[in-house]
Amino acid sequence: MYAVIKTGGKQYRVAAGDKLKVEKLAGEVGSEITLDKVLLVSDGDNTTIGSPLVQGASVQAKVVAHGRGDKVLIFKMRRRKHYRKTQGHRQSFTEIQIEKIAAK
């Protein structure tokens, strides 16, 4: 059984036992969270596609860790004007493990 969920403006295909990194979510490490924005649920034979969400479907997940991604460097430069600017950014993420997919 798998599902397609939406969180943090992105869509993920998940199955029970999967670990994935998503945009930062509120919740302590080890706590259970419920993801209600389920776009598609499939159990192999039957596939339910939401419009836009599947009614009564949810995904249970456990927060494994919080962290920050690799640094991305932004470099701006104006030629012939002696203007150079460097800026860095590290995106925060939450690593979750999918426990259960529930569909009615």
From Swiss-Prot:
Spans through the membrane: none
Gene Ontology biological-process entries: translation
GO cellular component, one term: ribosome
Keyword DNA repair: no
InterPro entries linked: bL21-like (IPR028909), bL21-like_sf (IPR036164), Ribosomal_bL21 (IPR001787), Ribosomal_bL21_CS (IPR018258)
Pfam families referenced in this protein's UniProt entry, alphabetically: Ribosomal_L21p
Coiled-coil regions, chain positions: none
Keywords: Ribonucleoprotein, Ribosomal protein, RNA-binding, rRNA-binding
Matches recorded under HAMAP family: Ribosomal_bL21
NCBIfam families: L21
This protein's name: Large ribosomal subunit protein bL21
Organism whose genome encodes this protein: Methylobacillus flagellatus (strain ATCC 51484 / DSM 6875 / VKM B-1610 / KT)
